[in-house]
Amino acid sequence: PLAAKNSFALGANRLQRRVHDELGLDYTLGQVEALALSEADRIGGLLVKACAKYGQGQSAESIIGKARSEWVPEGDLLEVYRKETNRVASGFRKAKAVSFPKGDELQVRLVPEFMRHLYPTAAYSSPGPFEKRQRGIFWVNDLSLAKSSAAEKLSEVQQHFGISLTAAHEAYPGHHLQFVT
């Protein structure tokens, strides 16, 4: 069936074609959906087992919520991001899990005040594909700088819980390596 007029959806026929042509998969849409649902169930089961083993049977949401509420980074948030981004990159380098292009450069910077409303916590800006200097920018939005009370500042900083995952997503092996290689 075709997608409804003025819809962003492709419709089943075009989506099937993209699965084949762009991903090189000879799966039907039904097979793709079944595989995705099966994988979601498998990972969900692993999460339940891990919560039972390490979280005394609590839900993942409550375990993560508790960890977030107890997380207080030491020092300046931007510096914490810089250190963690370097630590994550070093881990991938040491493991030789991905290749790092010669001369790549990543700067971790605060989001400018006039752009704070555009980024929830962090974002990445890539260099142009033909720029000689392949410098990317990993933007950190520290909204605690705009708060006055200690409780408000802490609440904003705790939105950044999971910095290592954010660094992996935005920098190494994430968007930065994706765009500079």
What is each of the regions a protein language model found here?
Residues P1-T181:
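N-terminal maturation segment of proteins
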